[in-house]
Amino acid sequence: MHNLLENLRRRLLAQRTPEPLPPTSQGLARPSHDVVRGPCDADIPPDARNTMMPEGITVEEALAVAELPQKHALDILATAQAIRSVHKGGPAALCGIVNAKSGRCPEDCAFCAQSSHHATGSPVHALLDAETLLRRAEELRQSGAERYGIVTSGTRLTVRELATLCEAAVRIRRETGIALCGSLGQLTPDAAACLKEAGFSSYHHNLETSRSFFPAICSTHAYDDDIATVRAARAAGLRTCSGGIFGMGETDAQRIELSATLRELDVDSIPVNLLSPIPGTPLQHRPTMPPMRALVSIAIYRLMHPARDILVCGGREATLGPWQSWIFLAGANGMMVGNYLTTTGRDMADDLAMLATLGVRA
């Protein structure tokens, strides 16, 4: 193993991730500086989770790992896997989503099928009713998913849509018990507080890419708008889930730049998406990432974030193909199951069988 990797491995393995907080009689965690390791930490205040998060490698070290020759790729994965097994060694975290409002988005994100700027033929529908949202929640709960992401297109929800969704959330929580995650666009502090009160425990809002590459991907809103949304969610006591998409033309250094920003924001969970080029979008002819480059990039994120959840989500089928199980060898500790927003995911039974074979899920 390369000396750089061996030194990083020793240093990261020497750090200790505190055990999950014990529940109180009310079912919430006692205030503490400890960090929670498991995926089902919806009721733990963010400040109680992350104040003693083990330190990952520096940006300079991450760049050095990215520049190692291809012959060291397996050693990079092995290093990340060792870190994952110590700091995030529990069962694989699983989440699923529903496309609760689709299409006609005014944003011009170059990768997105739902943008009104692109001719993709993507489905268009208004906000789903409570019964449909409840049915999907129950399906995901029965499949083993711990978290249910409700995703809507558009810059942000209207006041009426937000109220409708919060009413549905109360019922979903009462009847299924599944943890709720909102992915509803830009968020104000008042909207974040409303979601928290309705029973949402986390909020997902991707930065998509690094600040330096963002202008090549989107021109209709500012990078700081997305950062403000993540901060508003965290300030409201919501668990924050934010990541990006690999393979849009960014460099290794820009993926690492995004990782550093996510660390500064102290997010709880990092979803990694791999570009699946969609016809009609500006990135339709973009080749998919080489599988090993994608896996090495995931591994570098694990080295930078030893104890945060890292979930591989959209695009894993197109980019990784038969190597999908390698995401866990690369340091990921979870994945999205079921279908995505506008594309079909792998059969859930196949994913669950894969997880059982790997021993990361019963």
Swiss-Prot record:
Pathway entry: Cofactor biosynthesis; biotin biosynthesis; biotin from 7,8-diaminononanoate: step 2/2
Boundaries of every Radical SAM core domain copy: 87-316
Which residues bind [2Fe-2S] cluster per the record? 181, 241
Cofactor binding comment, as recorded: Binds 1 [4Fe-4S] cluster. The cluster is coordinated with 3 cysteines and an exchangeable S-adenosyl-L-methionine.
One GO-annotated biological process of the protein:
biotin biosynthetic process
Q: Which cofactor does it need?
A: [4Fe-4S] cluster; [2Fe-2S] cluster
Q: Name one GO molecular function term.
A: 4 iron, 4 sulfur cluster binding
Q: Recite the UniProt keywords alphabetically.
A: 2Fe-2S, 4Fe-4S, Biotin biosynthesis, Iron, Iron-sulfur, Metal-binding, S-adenosyl-L-methionine, Transferase
**What's the Enzyme Commission number for this chain?**
2.8.1.6
Q: Which InterPro entries match?
A: Aldolase_TIM, BATS_dom, Biotin_synth/BioAB, Biotin_synthase, Elp3/MiaA/NifB-like_rSAM, rSAM
Superkingdom of source: Bacteria
Residues binding [4Fe-4S] cluster are: 105, 109, 112
Q: Kindly give the PANTHER family that the UniProt entry links to this protein.
A: BIOTIN SYNTHASE (PTHR22976), BIOTIN SYNTHASE, MITOCHONDRIAL (PTHR22976:SF2)
Would you identify the family this protein belongs to, as annotated? Answer: Belongs to the radical SAM superfamily. Biotin synthase family.
Entry-linked HAMAP family: BioB (MF_01694)
Which purpose does this protein serve, as stated in its record?
A: Catalyzes the conversion of dethiobiotin (DTB) to biotin by the insertion of a sulfur atom into dethiobiotin via a radical-based mechanism.
Q: What is this protein called?
A: Biotin synthase
